[in-house]
Curated annotation (Swiss-Prot):
<dbReference type="GO" id="GO:0003735">
    <property type="term" value="F:structural constituent of ribosome"/>
</dbReference>
<keyword id="KW-0687">Ribonucleoprotein</keyword>
<dbReference type="GO" id="GO:0006412">
    <property type="term" value="P:translation"/>
</dbReference>
<dbReference type="GO" id="GO:0022627">
    <property type="term" value="C:cytosolic small ribosomal subunit"/>
</dbReference>
<dbReference type="InterPro" id="IPR018130">
    <property type="entry name" value="Ribosomal_uS2_CS"/>
</dbReference>
<comment type="similarity">
    <text>Belongs to the universal ribosomal protein uS2 family.</text>
</comment>
<dbReference type="InterPro" id="IPR023591">
    <property type="entry name" value="Ribosomal_uS2_flav_dom_sf"/>
</dbReference>
<dbReference type="InterPro" id="IPR001865">
    <property type="entry name" value="Ribosomal_uS2"/>
</dbReference>
<dbReference type="Pfam" id="PF00318">
    <property type="entry name" value="Ribosomal_S2"/>
</dbReference>
<keyword id="KW-0689">Ribosomal protein</keyword>
<dbReference type="InterPro" id="IPR005706">
    <property type="entry name" value="Ribosomal_uS2_bac/mit/plastid"/>
</dbReference>
<protein>
    <recommendedName>
        <fullName>Small ribosomal subunit protein uS2</fullName>
    </recommendedName>
</protein>
Length: 239
């Protein structure tokens, strides 16, 4: 059975690429045609790639690999958080901070600081501080929660990075490749398929397209971990 149908992808608008002048020639094998100055992605190729990505991701999850979802653009942010949480993956959905992977020791210290501040807040310790000091601590807490909240369950570097927008998340791509962390990437027509191990050619700007792809990948992770496809079920938190 196909992981995703052509009808589902059409309905999600997964076939719409970018303007032809913005294309990357390396994506030519995934492009069906051009209409009104816009490239149309070959959804037959996308379906094949989705099947491959599902199997690859399921196998990685079955072998205990840990996943990091990355997507900071407005239309992807909420979906990234929801689907990552559903399959127990870590996520970055606000802004990629330089060194999130390549300077992991420092980043882990910031995550530990976030956990400490959350414990202080829940225990009432911050409320007991002088008003000015408490305000400073709460501002620090809010900032850390915004940018690092999705990484609290990540005790070490991820084994796989799942990416929504390769061009926007170019720093994440560079860091993952520097550390030889494989990338499962949604690729619009302006992307470079050579910069990822598992390509998924599709519209990476439409919310429904992002929902469709990340939803299936989250299903694959849950199936790999739990032995069945737990659609819309809760995933285990990464420990």
């Amino acid at each position: 059975m196909a992981v995703v149908t052509l009808a589902e992808m059409m309905e999600a608008g997964a076939h719409f690429g970018h303007q032809t002048r913005r294309w990357n020639p390396k994506m030519s094998r995934y492009i069906y045609c051009a209409r009104n100055g816009v490239h149309i992605i070959d959804l037959v190729q996308t379906a094949v790639c989705m099947n491959n990505a599902y199997k690859w991701t399921r196998s990685a999850a079955r072998s205990g690999k840990r996943f990091l979802f990355v997507g900071t653009k407005k239309q992807a942010s909420e979906v990234v958080a929801l689907e990552a949480a559903r399959c127990g993956a870590a996520y970055v959905n606000q802004r990629w901070l330089g060194g999130m992977l390549t300077n992991w020791t420092t980043m882990k210290a910031r995550i530990d600081r976030l956990k400490d501040l959350e414990r202080m807040e829940s225990s009432g310790a911050i409320a007991m501080r002088p008003k000015k000091e408490g305000a400073v601590l709460r501002r620090e807490l809010e900032r850390l929660q915004k940018y690092l909240g999705g990484l609290k369950t990540m005790r070490r570097l991820p084994d796989v990075v799942v990416l929504v927008d390769q061009r926007r998340e170019s720093n994440a791509v560079l860091e993952a490749r520097k550390l030889d962390i494989p990338l499962v990437s949604m690729l619009d027509t302006n992307c470079d398929p050579d910069l990822c191990e598992v390509p998924i050619p599709c519209n990476d700007d439409a919310v429904r397209s992002v929902q469709l792809v990340l939803g299936r990948l989250a299903d694959a992770i849950n199936e790999g971990r739990h032995g069945n496809n737990e659609q819309r079920g809760g995933g285990d938190a990464e420990g």
